[in-house]
Amino acid sequence: MTGKKALPAVTIVKRFFQQYWRRIVPLCLLTIISLQLHPSKQYTVDEFLERGSLRVIGIAGPTTFLPHGEHGVRGLQYELLRQFANDLNIRLEIEQAPNAEAVIAALEKGEADLGITGLANNDPRLAGLEISKPYLSTTQQLIQRSGTRLSPSEAKIAVSQNSAEADLIEQLQPEADVVQLRYATPDELLEEVNQGQVDYVVINDSEFAARRTAFPQLSLKKQLTTSQLSWTIRPRDKQLLRFANRFLTQTGQDGSLQRLSNFYSQGNTFNAFGVKTFQKDIQQRLPLYQAQFKKQANTHDMDWRLLAAIAYQESKWDVNAVSPTGVTGIMMLTKNTAEEMGITNRNNPQQSILAGSAYYQRMIDKIPDTVHEPDRTWMALAAYNMGYRHVLKARELSLKQGDDPDKWLDVSRHLRQLPRAGQALVYVQEVRRYYDALLLQDSRSHWMASLEKKWVVAE
């Protein structure tokens, strides 16, 4: 005991506020304003169920989703998200964004529910967002222009600003001259090294493989590290995160995620010779027949690049191609098919493309209306290759075994059970590969012109 009388609690509080009120009041006001401007909202799944839609924002590309105008949308992420929305019994709405930063901003503002950024899970820019279970494992790669002799430690390396790749290069190659580019997309990074502005760029293996035909001069220098890709979800939306994780876990366990990933990745790989051959054929052979592809595609309301991809798989755009079984011409028609479609000269490119496009349209018309794009295209391609009866049989097997006869991934599994069906599965895969390559080739001109305007080198 000191002998001093203890002050009442009220007196202590009063003196405290008298001494510190000038600091406390402004702090409280700032806190109130902050909460009003940035409310810590806890979202519930009822919000988008009542709205009836899942709002997704992402960067369009060969590894995510590709809009085809009137011909629909397709791609790994589109099909995965479509299945997720179907499971929730709501519609899927997809908005394109120019870069990952725009995706992140939309999620932070609550303008979208879910985002496709293409960024590794450990990317610093994703801080504050909800991150789902991974849907894909990738490998970060150092990409060079063929013939580069500089070691990475002596070279100029381009990465996206404030990215996981920037952190990685700082750790692995601290001596390197690292150029951080603001808002850089995979296409823009690859174009930078393709034009010789830098010596190397860092990009994941799936992004490079999907774009390799557009950049025949680029090659792999070395693999750096593995990374995980996930869906990004608006901040504090724990309900949607739980639904997403449950869906990704289920599709991982039943194998559908792996089958979908395989379908969109196995056909992407071109070796160096294949890339250069394809580019040479695009420059020398395609211009000879492109007008006919466009004319017949317009007649049947289809994408001319799909028709061109079919022809490339059939003959490599060689009007005099002949197979061991006797099919010939740019569309490699059998004699019976040529007679059925009313043409007399299979080696005449105009007649061959006319008959081939009409025959493909006949297969499309046989597919039931319950089958939507892109499944409709894949089934029609299989029917074009081996006959509609086989596709019909595979759909019947799908229905009998509890799978979805309107989904290509399910139908293709049962198609494997039929004799000689393997060739049709490879055929669909290869046509998709060439189709994606032609889409990528055609789309590069749209952003190449504005490349200099969009880029700002980070300080």
Per-region residue spans from a language model:
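Extracytoplasmic small-molecule ligand-binding "clamshell" domains
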Residues: 22-23, 36-119, 123, 127, ...
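Extended ligand-binding regions for polar small-molecule ligands
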Residues: 34-39, 75-87, 146-166, 170, ...
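Periplasmic-binding protein-like
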Residues: 60-61, 133-144, 206-248, 271-274, ...
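A ligand-binding cleft/hinge motif common to bilobed small-molecule-binding domains
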Residues: 117-128, 191-225, 392-393, 397-402
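Export/targeting segments at the very N-terminus of extracytoplasmic proteins
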Residues: 268-316, 350, 367-368
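Short, functionally critical alpha-helical segments immediately adjacent to catalytic or ligand/cofactor-binding
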Residues: 302-318, 353-357, 380-385, 431
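Substrate-binding/active-site groove segments that recognize
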Residues: 320-344, 350-362, 405-407, 431
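Catalytic and substrate-binding regions of cell-wall glycan-acting enzymes that process beta-1,4-linked
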Residues: 378-441
